[in-house]
Curated annotation (Swiss-Prot):
The gene is rpl30e. The lineage of its organism: Archaea, Methanobacteriati, Methanobacteriota, Stenosarchaea group, Methanomicrobia. This is Large ribosomal subunit protein eL30. GO terms for molecular function: RNA binding; structural constituent of ribosome. It comes from the Archaea. SUPFAM superfamilies: L30e-like. InterPro entries: Ribosomal_eL30, Ribosomal_eL30-like, Ribosomal_eL30-like_sf, Ribosomal_eL30_CS, Ribosomal_eL8/eL30/eS12/Gad45. Keywords: Ribonucleoprotein, Ribosomal protein. GO terms for cellular component: cytosolic large ribosomal subunit. GO terms for biological process: translation.
Length: 103
């Protein structure tokens, strides 16, 4: 099991991540996003739009405030899109999304 918060910080520092539900939707529609993560308090209509994209989607188990803090930001983040993971392990979440046990 990866440390999601640490992987997020690493991805933001060494890769390319866009914050916010609108930007995440936009990059998901364009096909740029490799992974989308949304907070537990992300509005349901936004979650439905994100899940309808052909991009893996991960439900962060805490609030937007906590997701923002995990990203090193002083504000809530409802959703984010990983465009380039950089040196992080964030893409290991794909195994969880697909239901494959981590080794």
């Amino acid at each position: 099991m990866i440390n999601i918060d640490r992987a997020l910080r690493s991805s933001i520092r060494t890769g390319k991540v866009v914050l916010g539900s609108n930007s995440s939707l936009e990059h998901g529609l364009r096909g740029d996003a490799k992974l989308i993560i949304y907070a537990s308090d992300c509005p349901e209509h936004v979650r439905q739009k994100l899940r309808s994209l052909e991009v893996p989607v991960y439900a962060y188990q805490s609030s937007g405030r906590d997701l923002g803090a995990a990203c090193g930001k002083p504000f809530p983040v409802a959703a984010l899109a990983v465009i380039e993971p950089g040196d992080s392990e964030i893409m290991a979440l794909l195994r969880e999304i697909r239901g494959v046990a981590n080794e």
